[in-house]
């Protein structure tokens, strides 16, 4: 499981070094084979290859005539790029994906359980602050049974 927030610098070629604490798990679970794609926010999603393949199998089974499904398939599958950890634990984020997420030098890698999000650091700080200001734990019961069942 991937968790935590990590500030990372991209190198001049657009490579990102995965923090050491995640490398062994990524090498064991997927031999360093990763998939990076666009997220529904202005961020990227980074999956171990087997996790992405499972998501992809589920997405392609959804009704193709549904516009929402088609959009999600186009975004997640259409923009997906396979990448591999090198000997130093780095991988290259393709330029079109860096451009989509406005990634420059400083990025944030956020563990999300079975995947990561990659954000521009300035945009992440701004969005996180907005979400914190909007958050109301008292309103969780109004957000559906899944969120209402959470206990803090």
From Swiss-Prot:
Domain SpoVT-AbrB, first and last residues per copy: 5-51, 80-123
BP terms from Gene Ontology: negative regulation of DNA-templated transcription initiation
Keyword DNA-binding: yes
GO cellular component, as recorded: cytoplasm; nucleoid
Primary subcellular site in the record, as a coarse category: cytoplasm
SUPFAM superfamilies found in the cross-reference section: AbrB/MazE/MraZ-like
Keyword Cell cycle: no
PROSITE patterns given in the database record: SPOVT_ABRB (PS51740)
Key words, A-Z: Cytoplasm, DNA-binding, Repeat, Transcription, Transcription regulation
Recorded family membership: Belongs to the MraZ family.
Name of the protein: Transcriptional regulator MraZ
Protein source organism: Methylococcus capsulatus (strain ATCC 33009 / NCIMB 11132 / Bath)
